[in-house]
Design a protein with these regions (language model features):
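Interhelical loop/hinge segments that connect adjacent transmembrane helices in multipass membrane
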Residues: 23-40, 228-273, 324-327, 451-470
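Signature of the first transmembrane helix
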Residues: 4, 15-24, 36-97, 133, ...
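Transmembrane helical elements of multi-pass membrane transporters/channels
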Residues: 42-59, 193, 197, 213, ...
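Helix-loop junctions and terminal segments of transmembrane helices
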Residues: 93-108, 179, 237-240, 295, ...
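Hydrophobic alpha-helical transmembrane segments
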Residues: 154-158, 187-237, 410-412, 426-451
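Membrane-water interface segments that mark the loop-to-transmembrane alpha-helix transition
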Residues: 10-16, 20-23, 38-54, 80, ...
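Interfacial segments at transmembrane-helix termini and the short loops linking adjacent helices
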Residues: 140-160, 286-287, 326-327, 353-381, ...
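Membrane-interface junctions at transmembrane-helix termini in multi-pass inner-membrane proteins
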Residues: 165-188, 378-408
């Protein structure tokens, strides 16, 4: 997602060979400039190393929770998770993406401003986390969907406030570390977090059921906050960035200009996801929601590598744009879209062949039709492409277009599910996601095309001025 890389660590990194190596291979195959390829590969390498272990442990935690809670209990657990996701999206105020954008943009050119942005983000994150966690505790009885086991579901909703609090404050720290390209530190943290989540989920689910599984999520998030906190302090010290709260009010336009549309866009999507899961639970019961949640883990596997690529290329692209490297930006963007799309398609194809065996990991009672698996994997492939194209919107200053695209995505998802859920149950939800992501690919593709045309025009004008004024 940069131009200056980690200067203070350059001495510790061997120089790349001038005419061979995997960096050159990526440059030739994708068109990404050599320097960007090497930074991309370093970032992807560290992110992949941490995420493989961390996400594998998290996936194992889901399997353990499903086996300990049973089909009905796992469906309730899935509803708690989507409810927390909707609340935390609103509480986060888009601070993760805001911090990533401005830290990656100013970390070299204006470290003082980067420190003020970090101070503003941390202050806003803690205030919002406290307010919305309290709101979740108060609203828990109304958020519990369905008549069965309502008291235990309400208690789990209230316990999830701990998870929501730390997830909210973790958002800006994760964005800051990504903006600083601290992918090695993030990788190590992901490993520790994933293993801790697995152990806590197993122990708490086995002894305390649904409430235990929910509490385990909260304790894991608290550990993640602590690890991010010390990692961010170390990175800021390394780059001479001083986090300060003096002058934060002057930087509030950054929140208005970037956080507001980012929060609005994410909130629209999160509420749609929560409503869709609740609608499926009402129409078909928690057992069917549990099946969908199990199959949804296959979607997360499809997204795994593309999300790592996107996590690395987003600050890289943002820094390139800030530095005026328009040619490098265009090549890197197109290369990242091609790379993400191809890995997503490959993963979806493999999982489509092994889908039935995958579901058996969650227990014998977890079964899903081939149609459900194929529909959700197809939707995941479109999601990969849409997420890659989204980088053109993110790097530009046009996030209100993201709000419009998410609004269309939400309308398509909700309308399609409303028309089909009563007849087709869980498969209807998968088909609704397929339709929604199809619309997003079209809209993001059009926006990316428009954005690249603008950059090409700007590059041509810059070349003309250079030639006319040597």
């Amino acid at each position: 997602m940069l131009n200056d890389t980690t200067g203070l660590r350059a001495a510790a990194i061997p120089a790349a060979a001038p005419d061979r190596g995997f960096g050159r291979f990526v440059t030739v195959r994708t068109g990404i400039p050599r320097s960007a390829s090497e930074r991309l590969l370093r970032g992807v390498g560290w992110s992949a190393a941490g995420c493989v272990i961390g996400q594998s442990a998290s996936f194992a935690g889901s399997v353990v929770a499903a086996r300990c809670l049973g089909k009905e209990g796992f469906g309730q657990f899935a509803l708690v998770q989507t409810t927390v996701a909707a609340f935390s999206t609103l509480a986060s105020l888009g601070l993760g993406t805001t911090t990533l954008k401005f830290v990656s943009e100013y970390r070299t050119s204006n470290p003082q401003k980067a420190g003020i942005i970090l101070g503003l983000s941390s202050l806003a994150a803690f205030v919002a986390a406290a307010l919305f966690s309290a709101a979740l505790v108060l609203c828990a009885p109304w958020l519990a969907v369905g008549r069965a086991s309502a008291p235990i579901l309400t208690a789990a909703m209230r316990l999830s406030a701990l998870y929501m609090f730390f997830t909210t404050v973790n958002g800006y720290q994760m964005g800051a570390l990504s903006g600083l390209e601290a992918f090695r530190g993030i990788a190590c943290i992901n490993v520790a977090y994933g293993l801790a989540t697995l152990v806590l989920t197993w122990a708490a689910s086995r002894w305390f059921g649904l409430c235990g599984a929910t509490l385990a999520q909260g304790l894991s998030a608290a550990l993640l906050w602590l690890l991010y906190h010390y990692a961010l302090k170390a990175e800021c010290r390394l780059r001479n960035i001083v986090v300060t709260y003096c002058g934060v009010w002057k930087e509030r336009p950054a929140l208005y200009r970037f956080s507001v549309p980012s929060t609005t866009a994410c909130l629209i999507a999160s509420l749609a996801v929560w409503w869709s899961n609740a609608a499926l639970a009402r129409a078909s019961g928690y057992a069917q929601l549990a099946v969908f949640s199990a199959v949804n883990n296959m979607r997360l596997i499809v997204l795994f590598v593309p999300l790592i690529i996107g996590r690395v290329t987003t600050p890289l692209l943002n820094n390139m744009l800030a530095a005026g490297d328009l040619w490098g930006y265009r090549k890197t963007f197109c290369g990242s879209v091609a790379l993400s799309g191809s890995t997503g398609i490959l993963a979806a194809t493999v999982l489509a062949l092994a889908g039935r065996y995958f579901l058996h990991l969650f227990g014998k009672e977890f079964t899903g039709s081939s149609a459900l698996i194929l529909l959700l994997l197809s939707a995941a492939t479109l999601e990969v492409i849409a997420s890659s194209l989204y980088q053109a919107v993110f790097a530009g200053s046009s996030l209100w277009r993201q709000v419009v695209i998410n609004a269309v995505w939400t309308v398509v998802l909700v309308a399609t599910l409303q028309l089909t859920v009563s007849r087709h149950g869980v498969s209807a939800l998968a088909f609704s996601y397929l339709a929604a992501w199809g619309s997003s690919v079209i809209l993001y593709g059009a926006e990316a095309w428009r954005r690249l045309k603008q950059l090409e025009l700007r590059r041509s004008q810059t070349l003309e001025k250079t030639l006319c004024n040597p």
